[in-house]
Amino acid sequence: MENDEKEHGRRRRQHLRVPVFPEEKDEIEANAKRAGVSVARYLRDVGQGYQIKGVMDYQHVRELVRVNGDLGRLGGLLKLWLTDDVRTLQFGEATILALLGRIEATQDEMSRIMKAVVQPRAEP
């Protein structure tokens, strides 16, 4: 709200009174918290038709970027081994199988994160 005041150079002076049930109040407050904004800002944005983007989405995206980087590095190591690069001569079959296991685990982690982002939106 402070940013809004600075951008417009004035304070908001009009207030809306909206009667709600206690469970509606709890749900609105929880939604505002998930979005990372105040209840007033949440209601103002929703009331003006803005789509609310949650903070959790950004955290999941950062986590996916990290996991994707890990997957790229693991894939690079596997590629070196498959091309018979001299730098990988010291690695045996057990090491490569462990690498493949890490790649599979990393893919599973990416799937888990994607489900955490997508499934809450699919539920009513």
Curated annotation (Swiss-Prot):
It is found in: Cytoplasm. Pfam families: NikA-like (PF21983). Its main location: cytoplasm. It comes from the Bacteria. Keywords: Activator, Conjugation, Cytoplasm, Plasmid, Transcription, Transcription regulation. GO terms for cellular component: cytoplasm. Disulfide bonds: none annotated. This protein is essential for positively regulating the expression of transfer genes that are involved in the conjugal transfer of DNA between bacterial cells. This is Protein TraJ. It comes from Escherichia coli. The gene is traJ.
